[in-house]
């Protein structure tokens, strides 16, 4: 269920289940028009699965110490630029992840805090450019991982395909890449201290949030990150 953060806090005080995932949609750079469609897709996930309570937050300032104590995952959904949480809030988030929290970055999340390398180190890479936009093939390079289990060996999707400042293979385990002669990872996971980090570069257009392969990837990536069944 997606609800405003303040309402979720009231429900929590009333004894309702705590939110498991805080979905941040704040942008300080480019604002993706697909964010509402992506948020709606996560809403359906929360409605259809008893494993997730998903709470949307418009501002990263909502990631207070108290909010993080009650959360199992933080999702940066196409966030961009230097978010309002600032360096103090970022350090708090990084400590929480290293202590065992789950972090999921989707699409433009890799273009967040571009001047703060500690964020890119946690995520696995920093966005550089999107040299190809259109219908492309994604090759699933590891189908044994819980996030990709059940996906086909490859699939075609209309999307914006990223390349990164450094190859994420240096810091992460790559799960999928673009089908091209160059090595262009798109999906990966890594450990940050005791925390789990999952990232997918897919999700630029609205249509990506209706694509069954992308939806399965996001759901299973979140399940893995929070250690859900």
Segments predicted by a language model, with ranges:
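Solvent-exposed, acidic/flexible segments
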Residues: 28-35, 83-90, 211
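Bacterial Sec-dependent signal peptides at the C-terminal "C-region" and cleavage site
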Residues: 3-20, 30
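An acidic, glycine-rich "communication" segment
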Residues: 106-181
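Short alpha-beta junction capping motif
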Residues: 21-24, 68-113, 194
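Extracytoplasmic/secreted envelope proteins and their assembly/folding machinery
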Residues: 39-43, 90-94, 116
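Extracellular ligand-binding/catalytic regions of CAZymes and related secreted enzymes
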Residues: 7, 18-19, 25, 33-36, ...
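A short beta-strand-loop structural module common to alpha/beta enzyme folds
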Residues: 51-61
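Solvent-exposed loop/turn segments at secondary-structure junctions
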Residues: 27-30, 60-62, 79-83, 103, ...
């Amino acid at each position: 269920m997606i609800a405003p953060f303040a309402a979720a806090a009231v429900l929590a005080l009333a004894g309702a289940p705590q939110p498991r995932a805080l979905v941040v949609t704040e942008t300080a750079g480019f604002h993706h028009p697909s964010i509402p469609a992506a948020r709606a897709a996560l809403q359906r996930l929360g409605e259809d699965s008893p494993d997730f309570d998903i709470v949307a937050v418009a501002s990263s300032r909502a990631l207070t110490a108290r909010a993080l104590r009650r959360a199992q995952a933080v999702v940066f959904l196409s966030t961009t630029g230097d978010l309002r949480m600032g360096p103090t809030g970022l350090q708090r988030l990084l400590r929480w992840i290293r202590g065992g929290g789950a972090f999921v970055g989707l699409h433009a999340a890799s273009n967040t805090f571009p001047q703060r390398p500690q964020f890119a180190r946690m995520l696995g890479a920093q966005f550089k450019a999107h040299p190809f936009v259109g219908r492309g093939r994604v090759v699933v390079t590891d189908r044994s991982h819980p996030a990709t289990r059940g996906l086909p060996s490859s699939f075609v999707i209309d999307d914006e395909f990223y390349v990164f400042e450094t190859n994420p293979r240096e810091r992460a385990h790559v799960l999928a890449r673009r089908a091209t002669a160059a090595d262009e990872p798109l999906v990966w996971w890594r450990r940050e201290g005791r925390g789990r980090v999952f990232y997918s570069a897919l999700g630029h257009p609205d249509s990506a949030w209706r694509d069954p392969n992308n939806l399965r990837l996001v759901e299973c990536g979140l399940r893995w990150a929070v250690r859900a069944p």
